């Protein structure tokens, strides 16, 4: 299983992103939609696609923005899949691999991040669970008819993507 985290504030170097014995780095790739200096992901024309342990560790972290000057993404990814950094304190799916998306504050961009995660998981032959632990606002009507809601529903139905959302921050 791959856990995709759509958020801000990822410290790619954090020890919780290794396995419980601190031997294997589990972050597969990140898409920082703010960053330049790396090529964007395939089929997209913005942001930076960073793949592989050495590239991620060299990049160090995602781009700070006004919505998260700290490490919220690292925090919620740790709850979902933290390896424990050699301690007994681990995330729920501590053996899962990870994808991170730091998305621009726009409905289209967050939906792009979901599609990117789906494509990455398919390419690797893995199931995908997407974590959304942000409570800034909702896109569109809150009755299930918004573009956002319909897109999430379709990814869930057509591609068996599981979405997990916090009940608030």
Where are these regions (language model features)?
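Substrate-binding/access-modulating region of protease and related hydrolase catalytic domains
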Residues: 83, 103-169
């Amino acid at each position: 299983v791959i856990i995709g985290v759509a958020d801000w504030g990822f410290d790619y170097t954090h020890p919780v992103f290794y396995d419980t014995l601190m031997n294997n780095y589990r972050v597969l790739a990140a898409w920082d939609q703010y960053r330049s200096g790396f090529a964007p992901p395939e089929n997209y024309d913005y942001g930076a696609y960073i793949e592989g342990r050495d590239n991620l560790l060299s990049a160090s972290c995602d781009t700070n923005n006004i919505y998260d000057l700290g490490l919220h993404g690292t925090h919620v990814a740790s709850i979902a899949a933290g390896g424990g950094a050699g301690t007994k304190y681990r995330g729920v799916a501590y053996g899962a691999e990870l994808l991170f998306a730091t998305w621009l504050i726009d409905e289209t961009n967050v939906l792009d991040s979901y599609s990117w995660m789906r494509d990455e998981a398919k390419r690797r032959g893995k199931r995908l669970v997407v974590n959304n632990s942000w409570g800034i606002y909702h896109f569109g009507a809150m009755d299930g008819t918004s573009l956002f809601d319909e897109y999430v529903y379709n990814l869930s139905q057509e591609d068996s993507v599981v979405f997990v959302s916090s009940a608030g921050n």
